């Protein structure tokens, strides 16, 4: 049994124990990754190329791909950056604040999809490159949920809340965005900087903090 399979079993077991009526939800840590537009994907990989899904993500319809890219800033670069599918209307790269400092890109905290006024970067695959003038974000920490979840937890789409995360170093995160959609699966997303701060490990849970 590999690590991915083990983490999936742990997540499912915790969800089973919490049930649909609990106030706690799963917390997931996301590493650096990229969402490519169809145009940029074809430029980097070829006109008729199709990305290769290798792992389903927790949010329905989203997946990690086999293909990787380089992202190149003024002070350095990251190779092996995972592509998440399917393609989006605009290319977006999600880095942590530490990542941004490392490669010389300004770290702008934004909700996913809101990329106006964000920095650009150079993206490479082999001898093919694409330079984007916007799209690099530090993703605002957020909780995905359905309308039913939102009603049960007493929150609404777009609301900013505090969340207590029960990691090995429990802490309360402020400025957490609530994202509500019928297709969403209840879970909180943080990046690796935030994961390290709370002592994240597989099975970490969180809850809305109201005190």
Curated annotation (Swiss-Prot):
It is an enzyme of class 2 (transferase). It comes from Sebaldella termitidis (strain ATCC 33386 / NCTC 11300). Involved in 1,2-propanediol (1,2-PD) utilization within the bacterial microcompartment (BMC) dedicated to 1,2-PD degradation by catalyzing the conversion of propanoyl-CoA to propanoyl-phosphate. Belongs to the PduL family. InterPro entries: PTAC (IPR008300). Phosphate binds at residue 88. One of its GO terms (biological process) is propanediol catabolic process. This is Phosphate propanoyltransferase. Zn(2+) 1 binds at residues 33, 35, 94. Formed by 2 beta-barrels, each is capped on both ends by short alpha-helices. It is found in: Bacterial microcompartment. Its cofactor is Zn(2+). Keywords: Acyltransferase, Bacterial microcompartment, Metal-binding, Transferase, Zinc. There are 2 Zn(2+) ions per monomer; Zn(2+) and CoA bind inbetween the 2 domains in each monomer. The keyword Membrane does not apply. The gene is pduL. The keyword Metal-binding applies. Pathway: Polyol metabolism; 1,2-propanediol degradation. It comes from the Bacteria. GO terms for molecular function: acyltransferase activity, transferring groups other than amino-acyl groups; metal ion binding. GO terms for cellular component: bacterial microcompartment. Zn(2+) 2 binds at residues 142, 144, 189. It catalyses: propanoyl-CoA + phosphate = propanoyl phosphate + CoA. CoA binds at residues 29-31, 75, 196. Its EC number is 2.3.1.222.
